[in-house]
Structures are given as structure tokens and as C-alpha cells.
Amino acid sequence: MTYIYRDTKITTKSTIPFLIFFLFCFSNLSMATLKHKPVNLVFYVYNLIIIFSSHSSTAELRRLLQPSKTDGTVSFLVIGDWGRRGSYNQSQVALQMGEIGEKLDIDFVISTGDNFYDNGLTSLHDPLFQDSFTNIYTAPSLQKPWYSVLGNHDYRGDVRAQLSPMLRALDNRWVCMRSFIVNAEIVDLFFVDTTPFVDKYFIQPNKHVYDWSGVLPRQTYLNNLLKELDVALRESVAKWKIVIGHHTIKSAGHHGNTIELEKHLLPILQANEVDLYVNGHDHCLEHISSVDSNIQFMTSGGGSKAWKGGDVNYVEPEEMRFYYDGQGFMSVHVSEAELRVVFYDVFGHVLHHWKKTYKEALYFAS
């Protein structure tokens, strides 16, 4: 079956399907949750409208709202490179995510891309969505929004299917757009579509076929994205700024640094005093600092298949803080006073932790 997608706006013509879609998704919400946290309904309705109108062909940065806890803090997990129907320890990582997520009382989960292997989703009806997502991440603590970006493997499938808000009829946790912003009060999270930056996917795709619908003309798409990101970062009034993309900027892993992102994206992050850049792509867990900026580079790409050994060869050893070539995930806890990151292995053991106080961030910025 072939699906035809058009840029969607909430108009009179689209009101009826939107209302049907909203009622379906709303019926899956926990009434107990809404009873105790009625403000969540406001956020839910607003976000649903934005998501429903988001799968356009532009690089426009849509904004979603994510409430913090009553104490003002925000906690979330980060996982990348995972969708393999539970194989390569994906199910075991999911189990530990559920346990850590409960301990931390997380507000949401972030996926750094390569959500469905090997070649994304084939359609809205691809069973891979439920086999690799819904039926794997079943813990109560993981029944929260999953804010997701696309990876290069996702671009080998039907991109519009994975971006479609209609997937929320199957699992209302799923939130996937090309590039977007989540405003979580004390922290702003900027999700960036990094795959179109990488030249080799266009010049030397080998046997792979990429779905570039909505991206071409490429240069216009990238210019618009970089411009909007720069403006959004500059205008952010949040205490903390975190940027999420699939591809590495700095990495000691198999893929190493992404030259195109070093050239085009990194200067914008440096100029706007971003605190973290979080990515997947390399199937490992790692933390790299920076000698010339405030940015910390965190890789969380150990959601399933990992690449063992032989990859650590970073050209700036003084920046290398942590590298682990196995499966796992990371957590982030944000408060007014500090930003805290923890890496976990497939057994839930803490491998590495790092924190920065807001005073330190101000000192470096000055």
C-alpha cells in the first residue's frame, strides 16, 4: 500500500481526522495520572496539536512543552541504536532502563536515533514498530513520552511513516520529528536531524537507498535548520541547554568524529554556550570533554548491538573522560543547581558519572 503525505496544518478540512485521532490517543492516557496532575492534560493537548502538524518537508523547529516535577527538577533516560526485536541484549537493556527509570522517577526518554534496524520502517503497518518498541519497553516507568530523532538507518526506510503522528495510535509514547525543541522549564532540549549533513550518504550510498523526501533541496534544508537552531539557542532563557543528534561530533568509537558536524554544527553550539551534545551512531557509551568550550559530548549508542574493542583511538587524549564498548544507556538529572549524567551497563551497574553546577557553567561562560 502506498501512502501519500502532504504538509499538514490544522484546518477545517483536517479537523475531523484530528479529533478522531485525539480521542483515540486520549483514551489511552492514565485517568489516574490526569486526576493527580490535571496540568498534564494542557501540555498533552498542546503537544498533540504540534505533533499532528509537524511532519512537513521544512526544517522548521517545532516546540513541545514538557512539565517538570513539582520540585522543579527534570529526569530522563537516553538510549540509542536499539530497534532489533529484542536481540543483542536490547531486552536486557530495556529491563534495566525500567528499573533505573523507576528509581529516578523519570519524566521522559530520549532516543538518539537508529530506532529500527536495519532499514527503518517500511510503512505505518510495519510490525517492527511494535516488535522493537512497544513490546520491548514495557516497564511502568518507561510509559512516558519518547522524544526521538532519526538515524541513518531510519532514513533507509519510509521516513514519513516513522515521522507520522498516526503511529501514536499504536503507542502514544512515540514522538518523532526531524528537528524540534522540548521546553522543560529549567532545561531546553534541541533535537537536530543530523543525517542530511553527512556527505557520504548522498555521494557514496553504496547499496543503500535513502529516503530523502522532505530534505531536498539539501542545501536549503540544512541552511534553514542551522539558522533556526542558532536563533532558538540564542533566544533560550533556560538555565541549561542540551542538543541531541544521531551522529557524533567527537567520538573515539568506530565512526569517529563527524567532519560535517564539526564544520557546520559545532560552531553554533559553541557560540550559544550549549552544556551537552548527546548522540548515538557509535555503538558504545562515552564522555568526551572540550578544552576550548563548555560543551560535554556524550554518546549513548549501546541500546542493542555493540562493537567490541579496537575502536579507541582519539586524537585528543586529554579530552577523553570515559569509553565503554558494551551495551547500556545513560540518565540525566537536571535541577536549578546542577546537571548530572550517569552511564549504566546492561546489568544496571554504574560505569561513569559526571556533574556540573550552574555556578561552574556561569564561570566558564564569563
Swiss-Prot record:
Glycans are attached at N89. Zn(2+) binds at D114, N152, H246, H281. Its main location: secreted. InterPro entries: Acid_PPase (IPR024927), Calcineurin-like_PHP_ApaH (IPR004843), Metallo-depent_PP-like (IPR029052), Metallophosphoesterase_PAP (IPR051558). Substrate binds at H281, D282, H283. Transmembrane segments: none annotated. Pfam families: Metallophos. One of its GO terms (molecular function) is acid phosphatase activity. This is Purple acid phosphatase 3. The gene is PAP3.
